């Protein structure tokens, strides 16, 4: 949220004079959607999509249901215009992107896969050295199996490049999956390690 101006400037530079048409949120943790309000202010016509199960929470702006209040996150209020539905294909930047459910880090998470270039936007489902904290587990809900299923989906997609939610783009997908699976196995064997 504190980097909203930099986000707008970066998007403006990347668009090179074009209009921002869509904001697609992989999940609604504030470090991923905290710039939405600023982007909507800069491009008022932009369509903003969120994962299923979160549309009503955003439209009613429920900071508790969105987990901002309980976790101490700050996120400026933004509007949601629609849902990015797992199983759908969305056109972004003249390319067709497949939407895949990716629960684990967040129960509503999605990843986006562009099959022509074999590019995966993995959000926090896969990083080069692991994956994001499995928040449902911290709240007493079982979610390690969902992380494993999400890693299986990513492996089946066979991306050549991964653009993670944190860190640099990478191409050693097999290596990243191996690290993630090892980390997951460690957490499953000793859940207290995950909570630290």
Model-found features: residue ranges?
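Metallo-beta-lactamase
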Residues: 2-3, 96-187
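C-terminal regulatory/interaction regions
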Residues: 193-196
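Active-site HxH/HxHxD metal-binding segment of metal-dependent hydrolases
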Residues: 2-92
